[in-house]
């Protein structure tokens, strides 16, 4: 069990893509679901499914996306804001990942969104992770 749910999500996806797994699974939370929805929208993963488990808990199964048999759609997935050091940014100082080739995942007052969308809506927030 992880103390940081975002670290669990990133670690499971990174380990799954490096091992060329078709899917990975982990415990469900609202924040993880919002991040996965953004990753599907941006085209980094195929899909995700939430399955009930015992004890009224649920498990999320993520289907990873590959360009061909060996190359993952995600080249890198890095956590930025951590429980011991939160990183916040205004809409004017939102980071660009690889000059716009990747995305920064931002939690704002309007929900979880990419850095591009946050710039359009003029909102800042906590910079959770970079994906490229």
From Swiss-Prot:
The gene is rpsH. The keyword Ribonucleoprotein applies. Part of the 30S ribosomal subunit. Contacts proteins S5 and S12. Belongs to the universal ribosomal protein uS8 family. It comes from Ureaplasma parvum serovar 3 (strain ATCC 700970). One of its GO terms (cellular component) is ribosome. GO terms for molecular function: rRNA binding; structural constituent of ribosome. Keywords: Ribonucleoprotein, Ribosomal protein, RNA-binding, rRNA-binding. This is Small ribosomal subunit protein uS8. It holds the Pfam family Ribosomal_S8. One of its GO terms (biological process) is translation. One of the primary rRNA binding proteins, it binds directly to 16S rRNA central domain where it helps coordinate assembly of the platform of the 30S subunit. InterPro entries: Ribosomal_uS8, Ribosomal_uS8_CS, Ribosomal_uS8_sf.
